[in-house]
A protein has these predicted regions:
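Transmembrane alpha-helical segments and their membrane-water interfaces
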Residues: 6-7, 28-82, 173-174, 273-279
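Hydrophobic transmembrane alpha-helices and their immediate junctions
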Residues: 140-144, 167, 171, 180-185, ...
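Alpha-helical transmembrane segments of multi-pass inner-membrane proteins
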Residues: 67-90, 107-111, 117-158, 164-173
Length: 333
């Protein structure tokens, strides 16, 4: 009801884009999919995406709101980080009292602590700050202290995925500012090699994190998330998927977002999603930033992912297109 009321007030932009959005589900629905799962998934996220894309937000207010949210995340994270390393006290360890799963930030057995702020684990913190930072930069187009603070806390969380997230954020900013990709790649590779090989810089990481870096390909967490086992997967299922509602994607392709997309929608459906993401991004570097978020948990099943994607599309692609139209109109007149 909310959706159709909203659409009666706001003009739907780019009808061909919305039709393209339906492509993965249409193709996936031809094979094992359960009809009600397909309908719920497509309708829910299609509605949510349209609502956020078509509503007219005040850009300045949105930037301010995102900045405040990042502020809160950074302050709470640093308070937890400093509290532990100065007193040994784990701040915000309240989850068990409310019947929730305990924080997964301190391994008592090996005395390994990683701050996560308001989140259950460092990876969740890194994912949230990554999404906020990318959106903040796209809206603001400036490098300021709040963006730097976000990257620093992601780095301090010692999430292996978070290290990659910092690289992607810096890459997006530098490429957008006109720095050549070759220079950026060589610089990042040099820094990473220095951090891993130079024993004098190991103080930046805990011994556990450094050990995970040095044996990354045999790390249990890495294998569980990115290990691939094609056994039991037919060619038909590989191309068209098992359908939403099927179990076991993490057993076949690993527990990450790419695995979920391929397992549920197949390679054909995954291509459809890539077209959607590229259209929303508007350029290759933002497209890579969107794809990177799927290298962790299956974000396509989270509402916040589609809100994030819709806002990127709304303020990046559509604003550029409208600006180009105005420029053309002024030049022609």
């Amino acid at each position: 009801i909310v959706y159709f009321l909203a659409m009666s007030e706001f003009k739907i932009r780019n009808l061909n884009y919305h039709i393209l959005f339906l492509l993965p589900g249409i193709l996936m629905g031809l094979v094992y999919a359960k009809v009600h799962h397909v309908f719920f998934f497509l309708f829910s996220f299609y509605v949510l995406f349209n609502l956020y894309m078509n509503f007219s937000f005040d850009k300045r207010k949105l930037i301010k709101q995102i900045k405040i949210i990042i502020y809160i995340h950074v302050i709470v994270f640093m308070a937890q980080y400093i509290a532990f390393y100065t007193s040994g006290y784990v701040l915000l360890d309240y989850r068990e009292a409310f019947g929730m799963r305990p924080l997964r930030i301190w391994n008592h057995t090996i005395d390994f602590f990683r701050a996560a702020g308001l989140y259950e684990e460092p990876n969740s913190y890194a994912v949230s700050l990554y999404m906020l930072s990318i959106l903040y930069y796209i809206l603001h187009r400036k490098i300021d202290y709040i963006l730097v603070a976000a990257c620093v806390t992601i780095f301090l969380s010692e999430s292996l995925w978070g290290f990659g997230a910092v690289v992607i954020i810096l890459g997006v900013v530098l490429i957008d500012k006109g720095v050549k990709l070759t220079y950026i790649t060589l610089s990042f590779l040099s820094i990473i090699a220095l951090l891993i090989l130079d024993s004098e810089l190991h103080f930046l990481f805990s011994p556990t994190t450094y050990r995970r870096f040095s044996i990354i390909l045999t790390d249990g967490s890495f294998i569980a998330r990115y290990g691939i086992d094609y056994q039991g997967t037919s060619m038909l299922s590989l191309f068209f998927g098992h359908g939403i509602g099927a179990d076991g994607y993490f057993k076949s392709f690993g527990g990450n977002g790419y695995s979920a997309v391929i397992y549920y929608f197949g390679l054909v459906g995954a291509l459809g999603f890539c077209l959607v993401f590229y259209r929303a991004a508007g350029n290759f570097i933002y497209f890579m930033a969107i794809l990177f978020i799927l290298s962790t948990t299956p974000m396509i099943f989270y509402f916040m992912f589609w809100i994030w994607l819709a806002l990127i599309y709304r303020y990046n692609y559509l604003d550029k297109r409208e600006a180009a139209k105005k420029k053309y109109f002024l030049s022609s007149t």
